[in-house]
Amino acid sequence: VTDGVYDYDGYYSTNPFAVGRSESVDSKSPTSDSVKQTLYSQLLVKYTENSNEVELSSFKDAALNNQITVKDIRNGIRVEYTLGREEVTYLVPRRIRYDKYLNILYQIAQNSAKKKDKRSFAAFYSLYAINADQLDYELDRDSMTADVLDFFYTTREEGKTLHPGKGSEFGVQWGLIPAYYERINSESNKTISERIRDYPFVQQFAFMVCDSTIQASDLKRLEQMVKLNTDYSNEQMTIDHAETEYSASDKIPALFKMAIEYTINEYGLQIRLNAGNVRFDSSNYKLSNISFLPYAGAADTNNEGFILSPDGSGTIIRLEDIKGQQFTTTSSMYGQDYAYHTVSGANKEVMRYPGFGVVETITKKEEYEDTEIYVDENGEEQTETVIKTRDIKSSHGYFGLITEGATLSKLTVVNGGSLHMFASVYTSFNPRPKDSYVLNGGISVGNDSMWTVESKRKYTGDYKLQIFILDNDHSNHIGMATVYRNYLADEGVITKLDQSGSDDIPLYLQTLGALETSKTFLGVPYDTVVPLTSFVRVKEILEMFKNNEINNVKVILQGITNGGLISYVPTDFTIEKCLEEGHDDVKGMTFKELIEYADANNYQLFPDFDFSLALRDELFDGFNAKDDLSKTINDENAIMREYDPVWQAFIKNGCGIISANAMNKLYDGVYAGYKDYNVGGISVQSLGNMLSSDFNEDDPLNREDSRKLIVKLLAKIKEQNGNVLISGGNAYALPYATDIINMPIDDSRYKYSKASVPFLGIVLHSYKEYAGEPINLAGNYSYTLLKTIESGASPYYTVAYDNTAELKEYATYSTLAKYY
């Protein structure tokens, strides 16, 4: 590509080009054909049928059946896939006259390259007759091979000589027709009478019945035998079924239709799969997962290179470290969706940006001429030209970005290890969200049963990947970060910071405001609210910084309204009065006076409001938990869960998940009073780090719906407040945030990770103001400080001035215990 961002040649393949010579890295044994079929696939589709999970691959279940169509579209191609079986019926007669059955079996026995096929076919059929005379049909014995003749006609007596000690194989391995005679002659009169009653036509001819419990996989196998070795046709089968009064009741087989579009744009390669065009029989099958280009850009682990995963700040997985080790890791983009009962992920960092990549370095031997000096037999120096070899390394790779549908996507890193020699990173998704929950409370008997329900709200938009192809000079994580940053800047997601102000980086200071506690008066307990950091204390802290020439301070005022740190759902703007009080002989300060002081000294205030979590609800405040909290798939209120290292599991913390449907209403209630103060900034931390569905019956939201509502709200907040601070920094919130705290500056330190890299820091540096976690709350102060510096992040601290001992009363309250 010579226009746009590229001025070089690069390459990217949807599948590894060396699948044919693939082998396990450890044992050097060739990769099996079934694994190769997966490596050759652009799509892997998982679905459930009768609680059993089945996987289809686009190579085995589409390409090998000639069910792929390629069409030209503008700037690219469209590849249409039909995965599964298009025919509803199998070319396997379910009922057929005895003589016709023998003819089919005879052709299979004579023509099949596999000797066991004739026995496998016969094993699924049972004889229905009323006397031995109906079996008087003779095959052409003269044309039979010895093996086929033995299979059909060897009698039990003859078998004693031909197959000594193998009498149990009579009628199975050999002697099929004599066994049929023995069987019909041994049947009782009662059995014969019942047969005539059930099948009156049996008085005219004997017939064979295929096993009614036969599985689709076996039907497909028998059909292959019939198609490859006989002249039997669907027309003949229709006649046979009519003759034996059989009505077909075959279940419609699993069939999935979808298409991938590949187009070239100014950034490289764009890949699109429309979820609305994924078609299948949803009444019989439940879609579990679609893996999208699972081995695109895969790297050979025999070479050097790495995989970049968006785990936290970014993590590098080196091919040299994982060679021969088979593993798979999967994480959801943007973390947990708390509307689901199933929460996974243990204690790990969240993927805040939907980017990933692979780089592979290939080493080749190159011959070259060199001149060497030597001393001859006369002691004189001579020169000669010699041929030498040297290693030439060249790198190639790509950076992939999910530009649409990221909220419903999962990212998987997979390494073949003992199966094959490739490692890759890819996305997967399910446009039809579903969840499972336990049926109890008397509904089930014995052990609780799991019930799986599919959401009524389906995603019908696009899943889009933008592939940036990297050349040798840019095949590293710096190059990936550069193309990502340039893309975000070109799309208007981020803009350069104004460098005309202070040269100092900002210091983020989060102050803890008011806290409800219990006290006693004359032995009588009562509830009260005490200040941890009053407004006048905030001023004193800022004065201290000013006296030490620290002037670029941004203050996050947490817990200043609606009940303080354990706040009620924000529906209006009411300052906690205790924060405006003075101390000792120092006069108090109103919120408006604090704003005036901050403006005069160029300090930025960010009063914090949580529109995602409901800690407490007050009667008649405009918030209705029944209507405004997100619902789970079984119509329960969605509750946040946090990882507990003691239980090593996710524990409910009692905080309700506010539906994105209700967030705008809550913000409007707060802004009605907040706008009068003209603060110039607002903190809405949770809008940048939490994203959940809502499975309510009336207006359900999938995760993408919630994202759109949150983005719309953030745009409104930005327009009305100017400066907006968020936490975490989910990629969709970047256009509307001026400041980000708690941005990941480390990875999850997985076993297979070589190192964390400051990928996000490289992307956002000089485009956004950001900070990591509060340094003074970190488990390892020095490590966190160094990671802050490495990431180019600003320092961030959380402080409280007075009454800090009150925090210990909330030791079991997860949102506050960390501060004490």
Enumerate the predicted regions with their spans.
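Carbohydrate-recognition beta-sandwich/jelly-roll modules
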Residues: 1-528, 539-548, 552-553
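Active-site-proximal substrate-binding groove within the catalytic cores of carbohydrate-active enzymes
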Residues: 3, 7, 66, 70, ...
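Glycine-rich, histidine-containing beta strand-loop boundary motifs that form or position
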Residues: 81-83, 275, 294, 557-559, ...
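A generic structural motif
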Residues: 303, 510-512, 555-560, 725-728, ...
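Hydrophobic alpha-helical scaffolding
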Residues: 470, 474, 528-531, 700-704, ...
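Aromatic-lined carbohydrate-binding/catalytic grooves of carbohydrate-active enzymes
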Residues: 501-665, 689-693
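Hydrophobic, well-ordered secondary-structure elements that form the walls
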Residues: 545, 685, 788
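Structural preference for beta-strand elements that scaffold enzyme active sites
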Residues: 552-554, 604-606, 680-683, 723-725
